[in-house]
């Protein structure tokens, strides 16, 4: 990982979908090692400081751009091996470029090889279908009220920092996590104990997530994609 503090210097971020940024002459994906040579050279010439990759966790549907995940602990094999991805990150750091990855702790896809009804039961999602179903995206919401689900997700975030030395995570679709009525009509959601729309368990999870990451990686970038102007969304909790 780089030895400089992203918080104390200007940032210019280049967002990339690894599968479509550039292809080979035969229309095939570039590998992580190809990207290490071509993408980093381009980003450096354009004076960007950070590369933000759309999700690189394993996912079954190319058209989802990686946002409907089955394998949270697997870097997608579309572009190579875990060591190939490590090579890409190392090459970026050698050139003074930080790596951010989009991460999706809000919902997961329903494919049979994924987390939904993992052993025939609702392990990662709520028993309450109203809470579990994400009708807007055709996916399943995580149940943040389960400590084992919180542990799974926080451990996964830590995994990407520890195993691949990335510099930050951009947390996808935070509004979907924070609001019980996100994308829902009247009658499709139940207020919290205070009678409002906030998902209290999701709020607690996000606080624990940031506390855990910054305890071990104080220079990490934790970026919320939050579309509703939720007050103090970026206020430190540590």
Language-model features, listed with the residues they occupy:
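Alpha-glucan (starch/glycogen) binding determinants
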Residues: 1
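Substrate-binding/active-site clefts of carbohydrate-active enzymes
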Residues: 4-11, 17-197
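Conserved alpha/beta catalytic core and glycan-binding cleft of carbohydrate-active enzymes
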Residues: 165-167, 182-238
């Amino acid at each position: 990982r780089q030895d400089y503090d992203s918080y104390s210097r200007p940032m210019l971020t280049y967002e990339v979908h690894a599968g479509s940024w550039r292809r080979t002459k035969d229309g095939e994906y570039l590998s992580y090692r190809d990207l290490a040579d071509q993408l980093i050279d381009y980003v450096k010439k354009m004076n960007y400081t950070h590369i933000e990759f759309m999700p690189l966790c394993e996912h079954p549907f190319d058209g989802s751009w990686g946002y409907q995940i089955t394998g949270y602990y697997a870097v997608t094999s579309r572009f190579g091996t875990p060591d190939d991805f490590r090579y890409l990150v190392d090459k970026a750091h050698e050139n003074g470029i930080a790596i951010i990855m989009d991460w999706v702790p809000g919902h997961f896809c329903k494919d049979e090889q994924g987390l939904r009804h993992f052993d025939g039961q609702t392990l990662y999602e709520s028993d309450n279908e109203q809470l579990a179903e994400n009708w807007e995206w055709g996916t399943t919401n995580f149940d943040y009220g389960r400590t084992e689900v919180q542990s799974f997700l926080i451990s996964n975030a830590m995994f990407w920092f520890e195993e691949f030395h990335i510099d930050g995570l951009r947390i996808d679709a935070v509004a979907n996590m924070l609001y019980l009525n996100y994308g829902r009509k009247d009658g499709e959601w139940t207020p919290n104990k205070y009678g409002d729309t906030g998902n209290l368990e999701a709020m607690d999870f996000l606080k624990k997530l940031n506390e855990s990451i910054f305890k071990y990686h104080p220079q990490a970038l934790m970026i919320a994609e939050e579309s509703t102007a939720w007050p103090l969304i970026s206020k430190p909790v540590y």
